[in-house]
Every structure is written in structure tokens, then in C-alpha cells.
């Protein structure tokens, strides 16, 4: 049941929040409330227009699960909406408070509780930064299966709640492929209840924007660490680069963490990389993370497709230099494009797994939108199926034209996860019934992130 929700104008409630977590962890000034009510929806001009005036009444940063529980209880008692926020790196307004209320910052709940090298699992609080988990895991010979390009700032809870996949998805799949072993979830009730979700039960909170409960602890699967080296290959045309990337994706002789394909002039937008090597603006570039010692052989394979290795970095420099190639992959590709031209935005597209169909889809769309569409492809495994996942860059010509392009993608058989809506149920990746059932049982008043589902 959803009831009419109230703005936080109750000074007694704010006083109780201050007494609970301390003055410095409660934000009521306009600037802070705006900052913590904004995520990376600015990648979308549609969302920017729709969400820019959505601001919380108060922002609170609990320092313990007990404090979090008491905040939630107070909110329910006062019938106030609660929006949980990680680092605010989501792109669809996942952590934007559509109906004001309280934004809860999870950044202080940032403890790696356990890291077991035998079971290859980590127990973490939701505010743990993914980069911190990755670095700690690598010290013990393990690594995170997949992570977003925002890994140095994004929280694990935010990634699980609003993400998909990323670096590593070419070998380990996405969030749905066993990365989340279990999680502890708190309900939004006067007396919050706790549930431990395992196996298929975790589907109710993966990519659910927090509407089906508040994660307080996660158990994450890890994989054996690999010494990764990085390389950039250049190709004369997009088709050759796509043929190479697809072949490399399927070639089990090579271990890959990243295969990112960018048609020209996208790679020219990557300023830190171009400070080391001036990339040819007319070439299609493929960014790779490969197991130590494999760059030479992969470069040989690339020659069969007209490709040349133009830059490489050894494994002992991985994550230890000013940038990594992952800083130019996934939606960081879009970020660098927007820095070069603020008129750019993007789409999220799942192309056909069968190569000839995939290539025909790309060719058709490029013919329809030769001046408006720049292809950016990442290769991922979804379950056991290789899927070219596109984040094509789009020259924004207005909302009507944007949705004409989306219609054209879908007419070509390309599945679009629309990044220009905040509605969870508009995303084909959402889990449907498990999320709805989780919301009914753990968010009975509809106070958690209202308006998203």
C-alpha cells in the first residue's frame, strides 16, 4: 500500500536525526541537498530536464547499520520517503529523490568484513568502494569478477542496485551471473526486519534501484587474479575491428578482461591516452586488457584483420599509472565524448549474438544515421552467450529524434535499455516478479525510492 508522503518540515524529526548520527552527518543546506540529490543523469538531456529540480529535504549519513535502522524507522513513523544513495554514479536517476524526503548516504558503511581466499568470497558493507575491494582482493591473489568504469568511486551496493556489468564481463558475465552470492536486506517498517537472500532470491534486489529493500551486507564472489596488460589496436575501418573483436571474444586461447571498440573519432576524445600517443583520428581503435604475455600473439591475430598495435602497457603498471584503459571504456567512453562535445548523449543496446546478424544491424543503423551515430561496442557474456553490448554515442537533436533512433534500433532487432528514463520497469534487464514481490514484502508503504516502479 502506498500512502500520501510528507515533506520533511518536522524540526523534531531533523533534531532526532542530528542526535542520532551527529550534526556533521546531517545536511539541510540547499547546496548539499542538491549535490546529494543529483547522480550522473546529466549524461541524458532528457533526464536532466526532468530531474534537475528534484531535491531531498534532508540528507543523512549513518555510521552503522543500527543508525540506518533507526533512520528508516523514523522515516516510516513520519511517512517520509527514503532514497538510498551510494556514490551517485548511476546514469538514470537511480538515486534521485523524486518525491523529496530523506536521502541516505551509505558511504560510511564501508567496511570489508571478510575476504576468504579459500571460498573466493568477500563479505562487505554496501558503501565499500569497488576499487578498494579490487585492490584488497588483488593483494590476496583474487579480483572482482566485473566492475563499472566508475570503479574507483562507485560503491558495491550502488553497482548491485543499479548496474549491469562492465570490465570483466567478457570473461565472468554480469551481475546476474553469480557475482552476488547472498545479501542481507532491511525492510522499511516502523520496526525494520532483516532477510538473508541467497541463490535466486538475490534477483529481487539486483538492478532494483533499492525499491525492494535496503541492502546492509553483501557476499560477493571473487575470481583468481590475473596479471593484466593493456593494449590499443588500430584498424582501418569499423567492420574489420568488429570482426577482430568478435573473433577474439570467442578465442579461448586468450584471457581477456576488456574488449572495447570505438569508431573514429571517439578515441581522439581520450585526452590522457592521447597525451602519451596521438591516436590517428581516422582509425577505429580497440582497447584491450589481456593476460600477461598475450599482447604479441593478439597483435598477430589483429594483423589478419588489418589491425596494428599502437600502444601497450606491461602488467606491472596495471592500475598503478595515471590512467587505465578502463577509464575510456563503458560509459566513460560517453563521458569523454561529452567533454569534447556537450551535445553528445548515448544509448544502451544489445546486438544479436550471431555475428552476421550483428554486423548487418550495425551497417543498417550507420546507413540510417551516418552523421548522428558513433559506434562504441563492448563484448560481454550474458550467461553462456556472447553478446555485443553497444553504448553508441548519439548527437542529440531533441527528444523526438532520439526516440526515432531508438525505434530504428528496435526495428533492426536490437534490444534497447533506454538510459533516458528513470522507470525501472522500462528497462528490459529488470527482474520483474521477484522485484515486485520484494517491494511488497519489504517496502509495504512504498516509501523506498518512490516513483521508480
Sequence positions of predicted segments:
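Short, conserved charged micro-motifs
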Residues: 67-70, 132, 238-244, 293-301, ...
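N-terminal flexible segment immediately upstream of the FAD-binding catalytic core
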Residues: 1-73, 89-120, 264-275, 316, ...
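FAD-binding subdomain of flavoenzyme oxidoreductases
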Residues: 111-115, 124-126, 130-253
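A conserved active-site cap/scaffold subdomain adjacent to cofactor or substrate pockets
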Residues: 235-237, 248, 255-257, 265-313
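Short amphipathic alpha-helices in soluble, non-transmembrane regions
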Residues: 13-17, 75, 244-250, 294-308, ...
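Conserved glycine-rich FAD pyrophosphate-binding loop
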Residues: 3-4, 85-87, 95-101, 107, ...
